[in-house]
Amino acid sequence: MLFRSDKKTGKTVWKKDRPEKPYQPLTVIGRKAYVTPLIMNVKGRDLLISNGAAVCNAYDPETGEEIWSLTGGAESTIAMPFTEKGIVYYYTGFMVDPAGTDYSDLMAINPEGKGDITATNVLWKKRSGRLQLLTPVIKDGLIYTVDSNNNMMCIEATTGKEVWTTRMRSNFNASPVVAAGNIYFFSVRGDVVVIKPGREMQIVNQFQIQNPVWATPAFLRNSIILRTDRYLCKIN
């Protein structure tokens, strides 16, 4: 279910049941999504983009009317949809191929249209290791992300082509952050990797903070505020 509440009174403005049919074959845990919706303006109209395990939907945030849907994915997902230059990007829920390998698709879609846009509005999709945890970032037309196989990747936002990939030492579940002209990544083993955006992989700095990081950090002026499994830390 999706619903809108009045922020001053807490009263429900509208409620909308999400589609049930695409989720019927899935396990109970597989039907779940932990995704923060995205609101974007498309040709003068606001759309609320909400991707789930098996379907991505767009709604009118004023009324709750479903504008379009796009089917794809098979299990739970977490990453938030994101946008650049009028294109919506999101991870599907993870799937399993005939060989038993987990994977997800990174989707790029045209958010214009109405109804079922599965066959018409996909600009590109890129298969990779399970990609449903962290939300990628876009900088100067390039997408930066890390998959569940520890592959840090740079991808062209317009084509989906891989620009470079580098195998890292551990998993990255916190979302990367663009700050001070660089991109910061935080791993589950406490690695902090700072890279320079661009078509070549260039590490500016890296260090370890001893404790795992799962939550996306906040940046305050010249400091990083982050939560590990044991501490709330401020790093200058």
Identify the meaning behind each predicted range.
Residues 1-2:
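Short, small-residue-biased leader/transition segments that mark boundaries at the very start
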Residues 9-13, 63-68, 113-122, 159-163, ...:
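Beta-strand initiation motifs
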Residues 87-88, 190-191, 197, 211-236:
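Blade-level signature of beta-propeller repeat domains, shared across WD40, Kelch, NHL, RCC1
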Residues 96-97, 126-197:
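Loop/turn-rich, solvent-exposed surfaces of beta-rich toroidal or solenoidal domains
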